[in-house]
């Protein structure tokens, strides 16, 4: 799991698309993008084998993370078993553990140890030595991607994320897609206008090339997909 690069302005987005088109050549015409809010929480990696959750870890340094399987099993949003027809034999699901703003306020009122913000509360709750303590904390999970999915059938990130939703894995209700930079900017403006009413903290948006084959061709530049 790698960290994401930053684009701060509309010109940054346009320059990003220009670099993509230069790299992809004729394949770079009409690039479609998927957009999701970046939740301010703790990034985790879940591994399912034959539909069963077998391990979970934090992002750590991008290569090695802290194993938190027992604590992850206490979070209601994360299914212990995915029991649907044609469930892949191996799935790597990436997402964010977080706490809503309202739940954070309630937790701080009832706790002797005050947390500075919802992100710290989520991280501290997830890293408890005793899973029973974690189980009492109001932690949530939303997936923001995937690694290996054996036998993957979908050609786009958007469609694969909708498949995760069918498997009862939570995804962002604000996920969207666009085939233009102007469309990305419009979606950004719309989400910013709603930000105060989003029940959890976000610290930006993530734009991804929607076509998974193009993603594979583009690979990674430094630490930025």
Tell me the role of every PLM-derived stretch.
Residues 1-225:
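RNA/tRNA-interacting regions in translation and RNA-turnover enzymes
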